[in-house]
C-alpha cells in the first residue's frame, strides 16, 4: 500500500519546501523505497506555461510534455523517478476537471461545491500522481502543498489532504510542516512565536504535524526546540533544524542526521535498511574541492531572477563537477549588448551561453552575442532561442541574407529563417496544429522527441546516432532556408525523425573550436550524478579555451 507524506509551509513563502521534500525523498530512496513527489499549486492558472519567469521562475518540462513548476526539476535532480504531468497540478486544473464533469452531467444534478466535489477531485489527482492502482504505484508519495498555511487559496488543498489522511487510516500518512524562525538582531535571539501561530493555524484546520522543519540562518538551539515542541504539540525529536547552507546537496545529510527519515519510517511503519548517503557526501566533497574555475556568461532577458534559468544554472554546476571545476555564472542582460560593445562586455569569459526565451526584447543583443562568440572563437552554447539567434546571426553576416530574422520578432522580415511551424506530430503520433491566432497555453512543441544526428559532427561526438531531448517552443528553423545556410557553411547536424525539423546547428570544428545551438532544452535532463553530455562538453570546451594557447 502506498504511504503518503504531506509537506506544508507556514509564516512566509520561499522557505524551500521543494528542496526539503526532494531531500526527504532522496533519503527514503537510499533506504530502498520507491518514491515519487507531487506538487500541488494553489494558483488558478491551469499550468505555469503562460506565466512570466519573473512571476514564477522557470517552467520545467517533463518527458510527456507537461509544463510544470520548477520544483519538479529539483525532484528529478534528487531522485531516480522521472516526473510526469500527474506529478503537478493546480487549482486551475482541478476546477477545469470539475467543470468538465459538471457539463457532462457526472454529478447527476447535484449542486457542485468546494466540499465535497473540489476536495474529492484533489484527492483523486493525488492518487493518480502516486500511481495507485497501476504498475507505477510507489511505496511513498511525498505531496508538497504550495502556498502558505493561512492563505485562502490553500484551504481546499489542506482540507483535501486532511480528508485523505483520515481515509488512509493510521500509520499510512504523515505531516511535515516547514516554518520560519526569524532572527531579531536588536534582541539577539530567534523568535518562535510565528512558528507557534502557524502550527496553531494548521491545527485549527484539523492537521497535527508529525515533524517541524525550522528554517533559520543557523542551527536552532536545543532550548528553542524544547519551547517549540511544548507550544506546538510536536514531539521534541520531531522539531528539526534547517539552516542556510552553501549548497542544496547538503540538505539530505542535514535532515538524516537529525532523524527525519527515521521518524517518518516509524510513523508509517516502514521496515527498511539504514539510509546510505555516501553518494551525497561524495557530491558535496566534489563541490567543495574544485581544481579550477571557469567563467560563463549567460546572456538573457530574465537575469534579475536566477530562478528563471534554474535548470540551466544547475546543469552548468553539474558539468563543472564532472570536469572538477567551479563554474562561476554571470548573468548578463542582453539589452545592454550591441555589436559595438560586445567585446568589452564578454571578453573576460571562458564561454558564452544564450538560454531560451520569448519575445523581441533583448533579441538584438543576443544576436550580437552570437556574432562575438563566432568571430572570436569563444565556446558558444545556444539553447532554444539561443540556437535561433545564432542561426539569424549566421544568415545575416555569413550567408548574406540581409534583414534575416524570426517572424516572432519581425513578421515582415524579407528572410524568415525562423518561422512558426503550423503542424507537427507529438512523440505518440498525435497530430498537433497551431497558428498566429492560437492560444498561448499548451500550443508549443512540448516534451521528449527524438532526432537523428549526422555522423562526423560535434553533435555526434556528444550524443551518438540519436538524441532524445525535451522541447518547449513555437518557432522553428525555416526548412526553406536550410540549403542556403548549408551552402554558406552552417552545419545542420540533427533533424527530427518525422518532420525533419532542425534540432542542432553548429560550426565546423575547422572554423570554430566549439559552437553549437540546440532547439531543445537539455538542461531538464541534467543530474548531479553524471551531468549532461552537452553541458559536460561545453564546460570542457570552456576549460580548453581558458588555456593560454587557446587565448592566443
UniProtKB/Swiss-Prot annotation:
Write down the PANTHER family for this protein, in alphabetical order: CTP SYNTHASE, CTP SYNTHASE-RELATED
Q: Where does L-glutamine bind?
A: 357, 385-388, 408, 474
Give me the residues that bind CTP, please.
13, 151-153, 191-196, 227
Q: Which E.C. number(s) belong to this protein?
A: 6.3.4.2
Which Gene Ontology cellular component annotation is one that this UniProt entry carries? cytosol
> According to its UniProt entry, what is the function of this protein?
Catalyzes the ATP-dependent amination of UTP to CTP with either L-glutamine or ammonia as the source of nitrogen. Regulates intracellular CTP levels through interactions with the four ribonucleotide triphosphates.
The residues responsible for catalysis, as annotated, are 384 (nucleophile), 521, 523
Per the entry, what modulates this protein's activity?
Answer: Allosterically activated by GTP, when glutamine is the substrate; GTP has no effect on the reaction when ammonia is the substrate. The allosteric effector GTP functions by stabilizing the protein conformation that binds the tetrahedral intermediate(s) formed during glutamine hydrolysis. Inhibited by the product CTP, via allosteric rather than competitive inhibition.
- Quaternary context: Homotetramer.
| Gene Ontology molecular function terms on file | ATP binding; CTP synthase activity; glutaminase activity; identical protein binding; metal ion binding
Domain Glutamine amidotransferase type-1, first and last residues per copy = 295-548
Q: In which pathway does it act?
A: Pyrimidine metabolism; CTP biosynthesis via de novo pathway; CTP from UDP: step 2/2
Q: Which Gene Ontology biological process is one annotated for this entry? A: 'de novo' CTP biosynthetic process
Q: What class of enzyme is it?
A: ligase
The entry's protein name is CTP synthase
Q: Which top-rank group of organisms is this from?
A: Bacteria
Amino acid at each position: 500500500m502506498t504511504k503518503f507524506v504531506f509537506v506544508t509551509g507556514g509564516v512566509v513563502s520561499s522557505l524551500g519546501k521543494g528542496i526539503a521534500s526532494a531531500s526527504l525523498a532522496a533519503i527514503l530512496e537510499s533506504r530502498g523505497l520507491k518514491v515519487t513527489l507531487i506538487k500541488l499549486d494553489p494558483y488558478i492558472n491551469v499550468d505555469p506555461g503562460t506565466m512570466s519567469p519573473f512571476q514564477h521562475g522557470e517552467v520545467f518540462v517533463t518527458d510527456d510534455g507537461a509544463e510544470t513548476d520548477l520544483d519538479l526539476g529539483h525532484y528529478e535532480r534528487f531522485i531516480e523517478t522521472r516526473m510526469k504531468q500527474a506529478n503537478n497540478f493546480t487549482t486551475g486544473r482541478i476546477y477545469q476537471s470539475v467543470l468538465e464533469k459538471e457539463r457532462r452531467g457526472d454529478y447527476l444534478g447535484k449542486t457542485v461545491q468546494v466540499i465535497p466535489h473540489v476536495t474529492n477531485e484533489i484527492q483523486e489527482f493525488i492518487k493518480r500522481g502516486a500511481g495507485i492502482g497501476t504498475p507505477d504505484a510507489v511505496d511513498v508519495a511525498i505531496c508538497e502543498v504550495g502556498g502558505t498555511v493561512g492563505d485562502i487559496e490553500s484551504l481546499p488543498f489542506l482540507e483535501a489532504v486532511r480528508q485523505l489522511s483520515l481515509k488512509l487510516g493510521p500509520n499510512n500518512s504523515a505531516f511535515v510542516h516547514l516554518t520560519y524562525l526569524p532572527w531579531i538582531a536588536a534582541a539577539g535571539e530567534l523568535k518562535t512565536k510565528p512558528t507557534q501561530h502557524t502550527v496553531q493555524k494548521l491545527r485549527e484546520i484539523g492537521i497535527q504535524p508529525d515533524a517541524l522543519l525550522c528554517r533559520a540562518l543557523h542551527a536552532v538551539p536545543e532550548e528553542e526546540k524544547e519551547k517549540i515542541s511544548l507550544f506546538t504539540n510536536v514531539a521534541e525529536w520531531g522539531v528539526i533544524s534547517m539552516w542556510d547552507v552553501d549548497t542544496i546537496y547538503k540538505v539530505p545529510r542535514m535532515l538524516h542526521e537529525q532523524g527525519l527519515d527515521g521518524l517518518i519510517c516509524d510513523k508509517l511503519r516502514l521496515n527498511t535498511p539504514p539510509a546510505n548517503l555516501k553518494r551525497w557526501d561524495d557530491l558535496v566533497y566534489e563541490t567543495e574541492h574544485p581544481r579550477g574555475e571557469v567563467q560563463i556568461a549567460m546572456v538573457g532577458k530574465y537575469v534579475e531572477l536566477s530562478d528563471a534559468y534554474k535548470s540551466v544554472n544547475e546543469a552548468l554546476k553539474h558539468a563543472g563537477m564532472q570536469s572538477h571545476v567551479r563554474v562561476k555564472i554571470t548573468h548578463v542582460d542582453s539589452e545592454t549588448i550591441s555589436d559595438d560593445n560586445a567585446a568589452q562586455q564578454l571578453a573576460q569569459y571562458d564561454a558564452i551561453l544564450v538560454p531560451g526565451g520569448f519575445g523581441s526584447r533583448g533579441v538584438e543583443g543576443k544576436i550580437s552575442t552570437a556574432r562575438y562568440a563566432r568571430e572570436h572563437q569563444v565556446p558558444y552554447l545556444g539553447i532554444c532561442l539561443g540556437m535561433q539567434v545564432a542561426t539569424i546571426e549566421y544568415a545575416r553576416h555569413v550567408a548574406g541574407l540581409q534583414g534575416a530574422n524570426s517572424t516572432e520578432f519581425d513578421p515582415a522580415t524579407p528572410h524568415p529563417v525562423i518561422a512558426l511551424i503550423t503542424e507537427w506530430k507529438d512523440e505518440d503520433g498525435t497530430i498537433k496544429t497551431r497558428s498566429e491566432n492560437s492560444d498561448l497555453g499548451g500550443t508549443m512543441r512540448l516534451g521528449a522527441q527524438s532526432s537523428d544526428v549526422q555522423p562526423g559532427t560535434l553533435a555526434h561526438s556528444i550524443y551518438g546516432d540519436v538524441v532524445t531531448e525535451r522541447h518547449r517552443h513555437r518557432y522553428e528553423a525555416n526548412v526553406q532556408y536550410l540549403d542556403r545556410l548549408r551552402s554558406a557553411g552552417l552545419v545542420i547536424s540533427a533533424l527530427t525523425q518525422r518532420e525533419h525539423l532542425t534540432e542542432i546547428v553548429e560550426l565546423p570544428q575547422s572554423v570554430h573550436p566549439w559552437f553549437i545551438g540546440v532547439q531543445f532544452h537539455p538542461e531538464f535532463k541534467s543530474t548531479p550524478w553524471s551531468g549532461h553530455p552537452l553541458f559536460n562538453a561545453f564546460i570542457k570546451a570552456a576549460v580548453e579555451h581558458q588555456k593560454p594557447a587557446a587565448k592566443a
